[in-house]
């Protein structure tokens, strides 16, 4: 079984940037890329069927946009990939997927600059970094797009217990 690299994907520029970096890593390490989109509706007791249905329709639209964005980013990369949809808490869903696939790492996008100053990479990235036992890469987008040729870049935190692509 080919090892995989899990990347969280929504309809944001940050996740597209993270996906592009994940594709580079997957190609270099010979990993299968698993693009995970997580549908999340916070439900409260006051929500009725009339408010839940429009929220679900909006999630369908966001999912379609995320899938289309993934196809656009990965077209022509030569990377073996799949698009997977899960429901629930995004951080938890990404960690479960990584465990299920014995993934080499999880890659997510992070908010640029202001979040870095506060010490947070975004709620999903921060939750994964604090709770996941494996490798995590948070790629910051915005004005400081990652340049693999430079020693510096927007990577906020990478926690590798072993080299990406190495056997367990």
Predicted regions located by residue number:
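Hydrophobic anchor at the start of a short beta-strand
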Residues: 33, 81-82, 136
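Glycine-rich, Arg-bearing micro-motifs that act as flexible, cationic patches
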Residues: 105-131, 145-148
